[in-house]
From Swiss-Prot:
SMART domains registered for this protein in UniProt: Tet_JBP
Gene Ontology molecular functions: 5-methylcytosine dioxygenase activity; DNA binding; ferrous iron binding; zinc ion binding
Record carries keyword Isomerase: no
Effect of substituting K1212N: Strongly reduces ubiquitination, loss of DNA-binding, loss of 5-methylcytosine demethylase activity in vivo. Does not affect nuclear localization, nor interaction with DCAF1
Cofactor(s) listed in the protein's UniProt record: Fe(2+); Zn(2+)
Cellular component, GO annotation: chromosome; nucleoplasm
Disruption phenotype: Mice are viable and fertile but develop chronic myelomonocytic leukemia probably caused by dysregulation of hematopoietic stem cells. Mice lacking both Tet1 and Tet2 are fertile, with females having smaller ovaries and reduced fertility. They display decreased 5-hydroxymethylcytosine (5hmC) and abnormal methylation at various imprinted loci. Embryonic stem cells lacking both Tet1 and Tet2 remain pluripotent but lack 5hmC, leading to developmental defects in chimeric embryos.
Binding site for Zn(2+) 1: C1048, H1132, C1134
Protein name, as recorded: Methylcytosine dioxygenase TET2
Natural source organism: Mus musculus (Mouse)
Gene: Tet2
Length: 1912
């Protein structure tokens, strides 16, 4: 028989649908009608779906057809009629176990088999969706009173329609399809129902009659197999060992099977092995068809479940084809719709089923050998009939149905006698289409097994119960199963199955999928592989196995058997495990219910796989990854997919292909029904393993079930209604709907697709062990099959799939991976989603339970529902067609299956316990294995069900392509899916379950896991990759949702207030950090100290803004080697919840080396070091003296090596042919070489330490070492550093090294003075490294506050107290840095390029008045010093109102030039205002001042109320800020002070600055005799001008009316009040005045620019001054005051004084414009004005050099007390510090963290308290030759622009040359603006004479006040 089944051609064997055994009921016609209705006929796709009930009938036919198909001889009239093809498609061919019985009998047997294996379950699921039709049709088709495949033929026909490929006898399929297309489904369904009723289901008379007719037909075609007596319930009852048969009978609730199943469930012993499960199933089907549920109370839950399973098994012929495997797995799935069902079924039914599978493997062989023998115990079927045992069972089902029903009812106590039976039938019916499909796919494989009986029983039950009943049963199963926690069981079973299938996969003939199954537990392989191989040896068995597996996976029969076997076997873990299995199964059942709908087509394997998948879904992602059966030749799955054995290799392949797609779709659709069914059976399985415990629960649940199944039955009955409006059992409704409406089409599709595609899909599912099995069971049997039938079916099917199973497995897997991926992912994503929506739904109780037990599986169940619902459309026929498959010796098979099941239960219990801890673990494997999984596997996680369905469709289509199935089928399936989604409320709910919110829940769980897994490897990347799954979800979700729902915000590190980086180290907790650091350092225990710090974001600083420390970490002892500061990220549980922010290696470099370096560096740098001006050297107000008050000893920093240059945007040596990395003052190459050797050696020593302690940062920094070796420090390979900064007693204020390389860090080597080199010694003075944003944690690394307090007591943590410290505010600038000193040269270079004739003239003229002006300037300077001596120079003083300023200015006397701070800006390069406006002048001045004199000599003008107008610039530390004219007068010093106008931002930033930030007015030296200058406060003007170089700035100035000030100075000259709010106006006014009259009057008019205090005299002087020559050579230190003045005024006039004035070219333009616009300003000057201006200029120029000599004395200092008490009062203000030791190495991410160093009490760089060597690598240092290529490219571009600009004029060229100027200068050339301004002045103002000066009235009038915008 097996050989025949294996070898017969498609045409040879009658497909379950095609071969409708000529039943006296004229089953052929109903089959035709059913096929029309349920087949994928184009004419009535949905009617076919609606005819899912007919599919059940077709499943019977499928079973028969498969029996025929399996049999080489197509005795079945259906097969002769051409239903064999449909039967193949529907799984009928799978049932063909004997050539002689290939006709009706194989169909029946396949039906039983499919029922047993889950085809009935598939059919039932289809029926659950289309209860009305599916229930009726199965009754008609497979459950005739005679047990003959009359209805099976009809089922074959509908299976053929649904699965034309299965239809070897296309005639019957066509007839059935026609009939269905005509009315068909309803009528056929009614007939089927009648037929199913005679099989033992309490169904309408017409249903019974149909069943009887079918049985008669089957008896006629397969008298032996159909013999009802053969399938005696007693035999099955007596053979509890054949739990597969029991499960099949439970699933099928066929008469004999039901009885046997009852006995099985009641009696754990596997004594029925001789009787094929198919027989039992068949008998149960008959009985169940005729006798709804004999014993409602015996096994209330199990019985109900068994009944449901039976009903489900009746439906799916694939399960029957799967035979006992299918049946058992179907029962298992019915009892454990999800993995729980599979788990229990796996142990009980799996073992039974495995035995049956083995028996089926062998049983198929035995079927061939003893088709009758295996059935003989219960049925008197010939060997072929034994293969077609379902037929024989169909005859006994009348007998056994009652028993089975009784047993099922007893088990199910929840169901009423009839109601339970009906529900069982309905559940079976729902699964029957699936089973039929599966069996149809592998009719021969399943023929020997009782899946046929199961399908018939399912059919009978389905026929007996209304679709509503089926739905009720399915719903009940769904509810009950979830209540029983099927998800856990399912997961266990799934896991176990996954292992087993994976193990079996290698055995699978299709080695392709072995891989996936190999991952499964080897136990399954061992248990199932032999059977699988045996089954695999039979090609027909493969087909049957495939269908059986599909059915068994989906078939409730297998679930029932599994459940009964569980109960009978009394698995040690059966009952105990059952709760967990139930828990697991319930969620997974839900998922399966969802998936079964999707996976009806591939349901045999897919449902089973799905159950496993739900387990293996997490455990086994690889099978899931494999999209094709070849990719996943899961031997374990193969047994489930026996239909390949049944089908010829060619026909199997073809059928498998089509069936694969069909099964994918139907399996997808069925998957949901399976999920429902499997949920219900899962509950039953859960009860079954724990029958004792479960029965009690069942009794409780039975009440619920009775209610729920009834409801579900009603829901099934109102399948369309459910689709339209039923929200009760989303899964069930979806199942029923999909099974009903979509099932027919799915069946039609699956008839072909499931024959081959289904086989391959099953194989693929088997190969993709967790996936295919889970999906397939879910597909075929929404219920337990995935768990129970999965293993047995997988074994048999793998045995059967060696050849064809591969293909079908491939196809099924292809679809399944799609399903699996959708299912797994969707299950994962939707498990919780599905759980929530399901909980919300009528299934909520079940789902809640499932969710509580296995939230993910419920989502999976929902997904299964969805999938099954989608696949139900394609799989309905297979359920019908595969009910007659396997009738091997029930004893051996059942014993084997029982043993396997027991073993599987144990294994699953273990796996479940492992997996039970959480679905997250399951999910975690999914996450781990998604790489190997198909893309579809990844799909479902985040996307909604809509996406899921589309993905499923895509997956289905791809399998169809793989299987060669017509695209039309795929399209049809997709259409069904679409329709299902659109129409089915359940689908909608499934979508709701898949809603993002639900998805978010699992993803949140996964978020932490993903973070945990991904963050460690790629912390930063993990932002996106940690939670790849989460990201998908989070992308769609609100950013904060995960943090709300989840426990970790690791996916959103950007939310962290503190910086996020992990290249120093990160871990999930502090202990992980300790482990990490111990591994890095190599020591443990006390050697590693970890301190937790908390980021507050509140910077600790003194009242002056200087660094302070509140807590100090000190080295506790010599034992402590390493201190690690870590930040615990709040609300994070990810792998980077704890970050390393600093690593202090106390013994970094040898003490000897440290001491040597200290002495050498002190010597070299003290003598020749060139100080580097750093902004961090002072506070924000630039007035602190943290570096020291003595410029000769103050702290300083020196930079060496390569560093990033903003100018080059690369290495600063880009243009250097011979870069001097260690450049020292003067030409001292020896000293430079000496210094370089020390630093190079140090870098070489530190590099390996750095690599050891911070490998990630090190690797990042050495990435471009070979590309840019020139920019590296070090003598050996591995040079992470490019530069070194040596800080000697240098107090760095809070800052970040933003120019550092990303993902790098800085290494700080500390060299302490001799008195601070011992551990524990507390020196008199020391410097701390501070993290001002952090506070210490209240507890230590172990969470102990006592430990922290102990550290404080011991002194390792020093808590500082608030303190008041005397500080000095420096009025003058500190000594300029070496860089400033070098500014003169740079200024000269730039001056030469920018020099203009006008500037030269101006400079020459200014030089004339040098001597005279110098004297005057000196006098003014002294006066200014006196004036500035007042302590009002503080920033707030600057803010004083102009009147006060005037008063102060008038009262003040010039001060002595003060030494500028060493922070003046660098060379007058494009420094802001002064340099550019006065390109040469400012530069020269700046350089000169910066050089020495003016830097230190700069003074505030005596007039300025802020004696430190120069100090303002000093505060900013810019060389240019230094008073260009420091000594000439306060005005000259502050106004013209280059530092002032060099730093336009001085005034802008610090309007309060004591010093006029801009030297314009203040810098203009004025004779002491000049009353206006004397009274005028140039500082205010400077500040205002410079501060507001733009018009807006001037307008913003808070200046008193210029006229008032001017009046005071000038008397009442209104012309003096040239106060224009806008610099442009002022500038224009000045130019106009000067142009009109270069007299002092013009100067007076010019005065408004700087400030109201700017008198006309001053203005005149300024006009006379070389302001007309802004380009005068300032570098020459001959800072012609006129030039500066002109520059400042020009800048003001140009309106770009601040932004553009700094640009030399702009200065040139301005100068040129002024000289041209104001020729008199340059040349026309009155003698007095000229003298004044010259005197100012000369004095300033001379004064500067003098000041240089007075550096120290020039600085005006104000003592004050800096208080830090407020920092200590607020515990949230940071100030964590580390006391570095001599030779210590500190590693920190200076680019990310704000850091600082405290002030040394007595800084002395000649003998520093601390030398810190900061090694770093700057950004953009990654090109050879110091990034010369970048510079060359930049210069080439610049040259090109200049060349282009040259055509437009010099001004334009200059702008091009100075991009920054161009940016700053919104206007074009300055000349036009001046002209416009002059014109406006001339138009709006009149000239007024005051004294001897003439000024233009525009600003001379007092009315001109305020913003002065009227002249703009």
């Amino acid at each position: 028989m097996e050989q025949d089944r294996t070898t017969h051609a498609e045409g040879t064997r009658l497909s379950p649908f095609l071969i409708a055994p000529p039943s006296p009921i004229s089953h052929t016609e109903p089959l035709a009608v059913k096929l029309q209705n349920g087949s994928p006929l184009a004419e009535r796709p949905h009617p076919e779906v609606n005819g899912d009930t007919k599919w059940q009938s077709s499943q019977s036919c499928y079973g028969i057809s498969h029996m025929k198909g399996s049999q080489s001889s197509h005795e079945s009239p259906h097969e002769d009629r051409g239903y064999s093809r449909c039967l193949q498609n529907g799984g009928i061919k799978r049932t063909v176990s004997e050539p002689s019985l290939s006709g009706l009998h194989p169909n029946k047997i396949l039906k039983l088999d499919q029922k047993a294996k889950g085809e009935s379950n598939i059919f039932e699921e289809s029926q659950e969706r289309n209860h009305g039709k599916s229930s009726r049709q199965p009754n008609v088709s497979g459950l005739s009173d005679n047990g003959e495949p009359v209805t099976s033929t009809t089922q074959e026909s509908s299976g053929a329609d649904a699965f034309p490929t299965r239809n070897y006898n296309g005639v019957e399929i066509q007839v059935l399809n026609e009939q269905e297309g005509e009315k068909g489904r309803s009528v056929t369904l009614l007939k089927n129902k009648i037929v199913l009723m005679p099989n033992g289901a309490t169904v309408s008379a017409h249903s019974e009659e149909n069943t009887r007719g079918e049985l008669l037909e089957k008896t006629q075609c397969y008298p032996d197999c159909v013999s009802i007596a053969v399938q005696s319930t007693a035999s099955h009852v007596n053979t509890p060992s054949s739990q597969a048969a029991i499960e099949l009978s439970h699933e099928i609730p066929q008469p004999s099977l039901t009885s046997a199943q009852i006995n099985f469930s009641q009696t754990s012993s596997l004594q029925l092995p001789p009787e094929p499960a198919a027989m039992v199933t068949k008998a149960c089907d008959a009985d169940n068809a005729s006798k709804p549920a004999i014993v409602p109370g015996t096994c209330p839950f199990q019985k109900a479940e068994h009944q449901q399973k039976s009903a489900l098994d009746i439906g799916p012929s694939r399960a029957e084809n799967k035979t006992i495997q299918g049946s058992m797995e179907l029962f298992a799935e019915e009892y454990y719709p999800s993995s729980d069902r599979n788990l229990q079924a796996s142990h009980g039914s799996s073992e039974q089923y495995s035995k049956q599978k083995e028996t089926n493997g062998a049983y198929f062989r035995q079927s061939s050998k003893f088709p009758k023998d295996s059935i003989s115990p219960t049925t008197v079927t010939p060997p072929s009939q034994s293969l077609l045992a379902p037929r024989l069972v169909l005859q006994p089902p009348l007998e056994g149905k009652g028993a089975l029903n009784d047993v099922a009812l007893e088990e199910h106590h929840d169901y009423p006698n009839r109601s339970n039976r009906t529900l069982l039938r309905e559940g079976k019916i729902d699964h029957q289409p699936k089973t039929s499909s599966s069996q149809s796919l592998n009719p021969s494989v399943h023929t020997p097994n009782p899946p046929l009986m199961l399908p018939e029983q399912h059919q009978n039950d389905c026929g007996s119960p209304s679709p509503e009943k089926s739905r009720k049963m399915s719903e009940y199963l769904m509810y009950y199963l979830p209540n029983h926690g099927h998800s856990g069981g399912l997961q266990e079973h799934s896991q176990y199955l996954m292992g087993h299938r994976e193990q079996e996969i290698p055995k699978d003939a299709n080695g392709k999928q072995t891989q996936g199954s190999v991952q499964a537990a080897p136990g399954w392989i061992e248990l199932k592989a032999p059977n699988l191989h045996e089954a695999l040896h039979q090609t027909k068995r493969k087909d049957i196995s495939l269908h059986s597996v599909l059915h068994s996976q989906t078939g409730p029969v297998n679930q029932m058997s599994s459940k009964q076997s569980t109960g009978n076997v009394n698995m040690p873990g059966g009952f105990q495990r059952l709760p967990y299995l139930q828990k697991t199964a319930q969620p997974e059942q839900k998922a399966q219910m969802y998936q079964v709908q999707v996976n009806q087509g591939p349901s045999p394997g897919m449902g089973d796989q799905h159950l496993q998948f739900q387990k293996a879904l997490y455990q086994e992602c690889i099978p899931r990854t494999d999209p094709s059966s070849e990719a996943h030749p899961q031997a374990p799955s193969v047994p489930q997919y026996h239909f390949q054995q049944r089908v010829n290799p060619s026909s199997d392949k073809h059928l498998s292909q089509q069936a694969t797609e069909t099964q994918r779709l139907s399996g997808f659709l069925q998957h949901t029904p399976q999920t429902q069914a499997s949920q219900t059976p899962a509950s039953q399985n859960s009860n079954f393993p724990q029958i004792c415990q479960q029965q009690q629960q069942q009794q409780l649940q039975r009440k619920n079930k009775e209610q729920m199944p009834q409801t579900f039955s009603h829901l099934q009955g109102s399948n369309d209604k459910q689709r339209e409006g039923s929200c009760f059992g989303q899964i069930k409704v979806e199942e029923s709907f999909c099974v009903g409406n979509q099932y027919s089409k799915s069946s039609n599709f699956q008839t072909h697709n499931n024959t081959q595609g289904g086989l391959e899909q099953v194989q693929n599912i088997n190969k993709n062990f967790p996936y295919s099995k889970i999906l397939t069971p879910n597909s075929s049997n929404l219920q337990i099959l995935p768990s129970n039938d999965t293993h047995p079916a997988c074994e048999r099917e793998q045995a059967l799939h060696p050849v064809g199973s591969k293909t079908s497995n491939l196809q099924n897997m292809q679809y399944f991976p799609n399903n699996v991926t959708p299912n797994q992912d969707v299950h994962r994503c939707f498990q919780e989603q599905a759980q929530k929506p399901q909980q919300a739904s009528s299934l909520q109780g079940l789902k809640d339970r499932s969710q509580g037990e296995s939230p993910a599986p419920p989502a999976e169940a929902a997904q299964q529902r969805y999938l099954v619902h989608n696949e139900a459309k394609a799989l309905p026929v297979p359920e019908q067609g595969g009910s007659q498959t396997q009738t091997p010796p029930q004893k051996d098979t059942q014993k084997h299956a029982a043993l396997r099941w027991l073993l599987l239960q144990k294994q699953e219990q273990q796996q479940t316990q492992q997996s039970q801890p959480g679905h997250n673990q399951m999910l975690r494997p999914i996450k781990t294995e998604p790489v190997s999984k198909p893309s579809s596997y990844r799909y479902p996680l985040s996307p909604p069900q809509e996406n899921m369905s589309s993905r499923i469709k895509q997956e289905i289509s791809s399998p169809s392509r793989d299987n060669g199935q017509p695209k039309s089928i795929i399209e049809t399936m997709e259409q069904h899916l679409k329709q299902f989604q659109l129409k089915s409320l359940c689908d909608y709910k499934a979508l709701t379950l898949k809603s993002q919110k639900h998805v978010k829940v699992p993803t949140d769980i996964q978020a932490a896991e993903s973070e945990n897994h991904a963050r460690a490897a790629e912390p930063q990347a993990t932002k996106s990759t940690d939670c790849s799954v989460l990201d998908d979800v989070s992308e769609s979700d609100t950013p904060g949702e995960q943090s709300q729902n989840g426990k970790c915000e690791g996916c959103n590190p950007d939310k962290d207030e503190a910086p996020y980086y992990t290249h120093l180290g990160a871990g999930p907790d502090v202990a992980a950090i300790r482990t990490l650091m111990e591994e890095r350092y190599g020591e443990k225990g006390k050697a590693i100290r970890i301190e937790k710090v908390i980021y507050t974001g509140k910077e600790g600083k003194s009242s002056q803004g200087c660094p302070i420390a509140k807590w100090v970490y000190r080295r506790s002892s010599e034992e402590e080697k390493l201190l690690c500061l870590v930040r615990v990220r709040p609300n994070h549980t990810c792998e980077t919840a704890v970050m390393v922010i600093a690593i202090m290696l106390w013994d970094g470099i040898p003490k000897l080396l440290a001491s040597e370096l200290y002495s050498e560096l002190t010597d070299i740098l003290g003598k020749c070091g060139i100080c580097t001006n750093r902004r961090c050297s002072q506070n924000e107000t630039r007035n602190c003296c943290c570096q020291g008050e003595n410029p000769e000893t103050c702290g300083a920093s020196f930079s060496f090596g390569c560093s990033w240059s903003m100018y080059y945007n690369g290495c600063k040596f880009a243009r250097s042919k011979k870069p001097r990395k260690f450049r020292l003052h003067g030409a001292e190459p020896k000293e430079e070489e000496r210094l370089g050797s020390h630093l190079q050696n140090l870098a070489t020593v530190i590099a390996p330490i750095y690599k050891k302690l911070a490998p990630d940062a090190y690797n990042n920094q050495v990435e471009f070492e070979h590309q840019a070796p020139d920019c590296c420090l070090g003598l050996k390979e591995g040079r992470p550093f490019s530069g070194v900064t040596a800080c000697l007693d240098f107090s760095a204020h809070s800052h970040r090294d933003q120019q550092n390389m990303p993902n790098g860090s800085t290494v700080v080597v500390t060299l302490n003075r001799e008195d601070n080199r011992e551990v524990g010694a507390k020196p008199e003075d020391e410097q701390f490294h501070v993290l001002p944003m952090y506070i210490i944690a209240p507890e230590d690394e172990f969470g102990s506050t006592e430990g922290q307090e102990k550290k404080i007591r011991m002194g390792s943590i020093e808590v500082l107290q608030s303190f008041r410290r005397r500080r000095v505010i420096r009025i003058g600038e500190l000594p300029k840095s070496c860089k400033k000193k070098a500014e003169p040269k740079k200024a000269k270079t730039k001056k030469a390029a920018r020099k203009r004739s006008s500037l030269e003239n101006c400079s020459s003229r200014t030089e004339k008045g040098k001597s005279s002006s110098h004297t005057k300037l000196m006098e003014n300077a002294s006066h200014m010093k006196q004036m500035t001596a007042q302590p009002q120079l503080s920033g707030p003083v600057i803010r004083q109102p102009p009147t006060l300023q005037r008063h102060l200015q008038q009262g003040q006397r010039p001060q002595q030039p003060q030494p500028p701070q060493p922070q003046p800006q660098t060379t007058p390069q494009p420094q802001p205002q002064p340099q550019h406006i006065m390109p040469g002048n400012s530069q020269s001045v700046g350089s000169h001042c910066s050089g020495s004199t003016s830097v230190y000599t700069r003074q505030p003008t005596p007039h300025s109320p802020y004696p430190s107008s120069a100090h303002t610039s000093d505060i900013y530390g810019d060389t240019n800020h230094v008073n260009f004219y420091p000594t000439s007068s306060h005005a000259s010093g502050s106004y013209l002070n280059p530092s002032n106008y060099m730093n336009p931002y001085l005034g802008l930033l610090n309007q309060n600055n004591q010093y006029a930030p801009f030297p314009y007015n203040g810098s203009v030296p004025v004779d002491n005799g000049s009353p206006f200058l004397g009274s005028y406060s140039p500082q205010a003007q400077s500040r205002d001008l410079h501060r507001y170089p733009n018009q807006d700035h001037l307008t913003n100035q808070n200046l008193p009316p210029i006229h008032t000030l001017h009046q005071q100075t000038f008397g009442d000259s209104p012309s003096k009040y040239l106060s224009y709010g806008n610099q442009n106006m002022q500038r224009d006014a000045f130019t106009t005045n000067s142009t009109l009259k270069p007299n002092v009057h013009h100067l007076a008019t010019f005065s408004p620019y700087p400030t109201p205090k700017m008198d006309s005299h001053f203005m005149g002087a300024a006009s006379r001054s070389p302001y007309s020559h802004p380009h005068t050579d300032y570098k020459t230190s001959e800072h012609h005051l006129p030039s500066h003045t002109i520059y400042s005024y020009t800048a003001a006039a140009s309106g770009s004084s601040s932004s553009h004035a700094f640009h030399n070219k702009e200065n040139d333009n301005i100068a040129n414009g002024l000289s041209r616009v104001l020729p008199g300003f340059n040349h026309d000057r009155t003698a007095s004005a000229q003298e004044l201006l010259y005197s100012l200029t000369g004095s300033s120029q001379e004064k500067q050099p003098e000041v240089s000599g007075q550096d120290a004395a020039a600085v005006q200092e104000i003592e004050y007390w800096s208080d830090s008490e407020h920092n200590f009062q607020d515990p949230c203000i940071g100030g964590v510090a580390i006391a570095p030791t001599h030779g210590s190495i500190l590693i920190e991410c200076a680019k990310c963290e704000v850091h600082a160093t405290t002030k040394v009490n007595d800084p002395d760089r000649n003998h520093p308290t601390r030398i810190s060597l900061v090694l770093y690598r700057h950004k953009n240092l990654f090109l050879p030759k110091h990034c010369l290529a970048l510079w060359e490219a930049k210069m080439a571009e610049k040259a090109r622009k200049e060349e282009e600009c040259g055509k437009n004029g010099s001004d334009h060229v200059s702008q091009k040359n100075h991009g920054k100027q161009e940016k700053r200068e919104p206007t074009g050339p300055q000349e036009p603006s001046y002209l416009r301004f002059i014109q406006s002045l001339a138009e709006n103002t009149g000239s007024v004479t005051t004294d001897s000066t003439v000024t233009t009235s525009p600003y001379a009038f007092t009315q001109v006040t305020g913003p002065y915008n009227t002249f703009v």
